Every structure is written in structure tokens, then in C-alpha cells.
Amino acid sequence: MISVPLLKGKRVLVMGLGKSGTATARALLAAGAGVMAWDDGEAARKSGAEAGIPIRDPSLLPLDKADLLVWSPGIPHTHPQPHPLAEKARAANLPMVCDVELLAQALPGARMLAVTGTNGKSTTTTLLAHVLDECGLPVAAGGNLGTAALDLPELPGDGRYVLELSSYQLELTHSLKLGVAILLNVTPDHLGRHGGMAGYIAAKRRVFDFLTPGGAAVVGIDDGPCRAIVAELDRRGIRVVKISVDSVLAEGVSAPEGVLLDNAKPVCDLKTIPSLPGRHNWQNACAVYAAARAEGLSPKQIAQALATYPGLAHRQELVGEDHGIAWINDSKATNADAVEKALVCYDHVYWILGGQAKEGGIASLEKHFGRIQHAFLIGEATEAFAATLDGKVRFTRCATLDKAVAAARNLAVSDSIPGAVVLLSPACASWDQFTSFEHRGDTFRELVQAFDQGGAA
């Protein structure tokens, strides 16, 4: 746990009692702050109270009695409709931050590296932490991924904090000092929360405002918004390391054919690393290589560490093989852009998709429909996706994940196509049937692993 002694004796409201909010409340209580916490969900309030966190309805409290409001980034505070407490806090001029800001204030001298982008953040964060650790550096990874910011351990002076930062967290952070800031890509996502694409890009761009003098901005240049940001950073005189998987870069890190190139010179063959399949993972590896080089590691050290990466759950995770069929859990793929990165890796796909649809649907994936043997539709998006697939891809309406798994297994075993893959890559949020994409992926894994125990097809 990170100590936040600067808030001793302060009166702090904590809004949201998920992972980050609960960790924040615990850290504040340990520091001697006066904490009042709230969550609109009854179950979260009950869990917080059982953990010893004081629960108070903030609507009944005069906000001029508080010194700070710590906001859980998953709760809207501006768009599409701000939470009433956010509006009251602004009217009362009550400072509003997230837990990452408290981490930055608590550890102003710590070496921090940040990763953001629409897709690939979690893999890049864990891969970078893995490389630093393999090369002998004390490291802790968290933030939007895994461990909440204030649940991270305190590291020795040569330690590195690798932080995955969402656009929501970047909006509520002000004091970070970063040695490396990575922006992988920017494609439409969470637009409702940011008032449109311009607001979303502005939130992502903020990561570079926190670079210390001499710090490195590592930026993917394979999309228009990121190329525009690179041009802006160049004008500001910020050190930029460009990465690409679309073309060879004479200056930068690239891997258009799967061989990682440093200023166009070969370093290692990413295609030989099973845990990093596909161009999207090559982009992640390029970003990690660039960041690790900025931290002083040698190409040989980095290449050796990349080769030992075990992979990350719910990101093209191989969860089983049955009758020669590979079962891939890509539950993290909640939009079409993320799904595309998985589809291009396989030729004979039995595709499980659906859930709570996001803007844009799956029409953009039509160029890859030839890879799909059959689609199995679940959740709220079933009819919308059926309309897109009709006449182009054979599909079955399955309603639920367990029925989709059974149907996919039956058909894939019957077809007996060499190299067949059953791919859970939903192109949707999970909240219509699951609590999170992790819950959805874990359920898929359990269903597949039940095959070994004689589970019914």
C-alpha cells in the first residue's frame, strides 16, 4: 500500500467503491484522513462497510466541509451526463482527482512510466513490467490494470512504476512526472464519456503533459490522430520515438513483417514468441522495446526478456485444445478494432461474439468475413449483428455463452478442419450478462476446461 501522509487530518470524500475506490479509502484511513465514502451500488456499500470504510451519503453532506473528492474514473463526471455529486463538487469548488493523482503526490520522486491508447494498454503494461523485471529492475505495474494505484508497493529508489492509464484517469490527474509516456493508438471508443472524438483525443494527449525534461514520448504512428499528436510534440521540442507495424522506420521502432527493427536494423523475430501473436502485439512489443531502451536497457537484454513473456489473460489467451481445435479467449476485445486484431491471426474461425453493443457495430470487419466458418451470437447485440452477417457469414443465435460454446464445439468437431479456432472475441461490452470482460473470459475458460472433465458438447 502507498502511504499518503500529506492527507493526514484532511476530510476526503471517496466516490465509488470498486477496486480503486476501496484501495483509496484504505490508504486514506491508514494515513489518518477523515474519510467519507459512497457508491451508488448497495452491494459495494455493504462490502465497503464490512471492510471498515465509513459510508456516508454525500448528498446529505455540505461539501464546503470537505477538502478533497477522490473520484472513481468509471463514474461519469462530465459526459454524457455528470453524476449529481460531480456537479455539486464543481459548484462548491471542491478539488476532484483520481487515485493516480494521489499516487503522484505521494511519490513525487519515483520513476514512472505510463501507457495509454485505445487498444493494447494492458498487454503493453504487463509486457513492459515483465521486461524491466527480467532485466533486474524493481518494478510494480497497475493503475487501470490489475492492482489499483494506491495498492502498489513502495519501491526502492531505482524502482519503476508502470502505470496503465485510461482516458478517464488522465482527465483527473495533474501532478504525474513521467520518464516515459506511451500512446499506442487512438480509435473511436468511449466517445459518449468525452463528448465526442475531439474530447477523447484531448484526454489521451494529456499523458504527454506529464513528461519530465528529457523524457521520451513513445507514439504509434499508424493512425491519423496519433500522427497529428506526433507533429504537435515535435513542434513542442519533445523527444519522440515513433513506432509502426505498417512500415519500416529509418528512425524509430517498427515491425511490419514481425521482425522488430530499431532504426531499420533487426533486433529479434517476434513471430517466434507464442504469447505475442498478430500485428497488434507486434505494436505492443515495439512500444515496450522503445520504452525499455529509453530506460537504458540494451537491445539484447530486451529481446531476451520479450521471448519469456507468458502472455495476459483475456487477450488472445489459449485456454484449451480439444479435438485439434484451439480455444482462444479474447474477451477483452470489446470493439471491432480490437476484434480485427484477433481475426487476422487465424484462417478458420468459429467466432463467438455479442453482448452489449458499442457504437459502430461490426460492419468494419466485413473484409475479414472470409476467415469465419460460422458465427455464434449472444447477448443484446444478437439481432444487430445478425443483420450485418446475413448473407455473408453463417450464424446461429445462441443467446448465452454456454450455449454458444456447446454449439461451436459441436460444429467445429463435426467440420474437422485443420487449424480450426474457436474464438471468443465479442466486439461488445459484457455488462448485459457478466460483471466485466474478465468475468466473461473466466466463464469461457471454465466452460472449455470442463471438456477435460467430460463436459457435454
Curated annotation (Swiss-Prot):
Its main location: cytoplasm. The keyword Protein biosynthesis does not apply. It catalyses: UDP-N-acetyl-alpha-D-muramoyl-L-alanine + D-glutamate + ATP = UDP-N-acetyl-alpha-D-muramoyl-L-alanyl-D-glutamate + ADP + phosphate + H(+). Gene3D superfamilies: Mur ligase, C-terminal domain, Mur-like, catalytic domain, NAD(P)-binding Rossmann-like Domain. One of its GO terms (biological process) is peptidoglycan biosynthetic process. Coiled coil: none annotated. GO terms for molecular function: ATP binding; tetrahydrofolylpolyglutamate synthase activity; UDP-N-acetylmuramoylalanine-D-glutamate ligase activity. Belongs to the MurCDEF family. This is UDP-N-acetylmuramoylalanine--D-glutamate ligase.
